[in-house]
Design a protein with these regions (language model features):
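Short, flexible loop/turn elements at secondary-structure junctions
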Residues: 48-50, 62-64, 75-77, 134-138, ...
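Peripheral (often C-terminal) accessory segments that flank ATP-dependent C-N-forming ligase machineries
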Residues: 171-233
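Beta-strand scaffold of nucleotide-dependent catalytic cores
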Residues: 56-78, 83-87, 148-153, 163-165
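C-terminal catalytic subdomain
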Residues: 147-181
Length: 233
């Protein structure tokens, strides 16, 4: 049997709910989830799960007059159930190195092809940023890397764009790191982690930009459960 996943799109919240189906036969819980999704949204999409290696996205800007501008590459992580966990920070040449090495000219062709598709579909009806989530996976037939060119399109200023702008505006040249979103359910644990990282990775600036170290992107108290932070090395 091949593992599949069902997706329910929640348009207002700009998110996707995932239901993993390890077997073809649906359980009562599976049926309840799918029925609920159909009642709320009218449709679900089902597709075979891939042997994921890396999540990434291409970020664009549409001016609403038929023009699309490529903003950059976003390399990010996701938990097993699909929840976003963070982005890699760094210069575009660093982020693109894996893709250029493994896909060569095909990566540039993909960038151009996706950009043209975005222009035709959204160029005259949408003004703003949008990201196309993609996936590097291993082909089961030969074990080689392949790319799924469109997992979903997010018509908003994505976390990938946030990471892209942080890399461009606030990181020192050649600095690399991670932007992370974490959750801890135990009271006080997030605060303890924050204090530890602040001491273990002291912030070091160069010419007004982050050279290395830890910086929290939100206030952290003893009641905090979610954290957003940058760790540069």
């Amino acid at each position: 049997s091949r593992m599949c996943s069902a997706r329910m799109r929640r348009v207002r919240r700009f998110s996707i709910s995932l239901l993993w189906l390890p077997e073809r036969k649906l359980t009562a819980k599976d049926r309840t989830w799918i029925e609920g999704a159909l009642n709320k949204q009218g449709c679900v999409s089902i597709e075979c799960a891939l042997d994921k290696y890396q999540d990434f996205a291409m970020e664009f800007y549409s001016d609403g007059n038929g023009n699309i501008r490529y903003e950059g590459l976003s390399v990010f992580g996701a938990e097993k159930k699909g929840a976003y966990s963070g982005n890699v920070l760094g210069e575009q040449t660093y982020l693109e190195s894996f893709f250029v090495e493994n896909f060569g000219d095909k990566f540039q062709q993909l960038k151009e092809t996706v950009g043209e598709a975005i222009r035709q579909i959204y160029g005259n009806i949408y003004t703003g940023y949008l990201g196309v989530d993609m996936l590097v996976y291993r082909n089961k037939a030969n074990g080689e890397f392949a790319i799924h060119p469109c997992i979903e399109v997010n018509m908003r200023y994505t976390m990938g764009m946030v990471a892209l702008r942080i890399s461009q505006k606030y990181l020192a040249p050649n600095a690399r790191g991670d932007m992370r979103i974490t959750y801890t359910s135990k009271p006080g644990e997030a605060y303890e982690q924050h204090c530890f990282m602040k001491k273990a990775y002291p912030l070091e600036m160069k010419d007004g930009k982050i050279k290395e170290g830890y910086i929290s992107l939100c206030p952290v108290t003893k009641e905090t459960k979610y954290r957003a932070y940058i760790l540069v090395f």
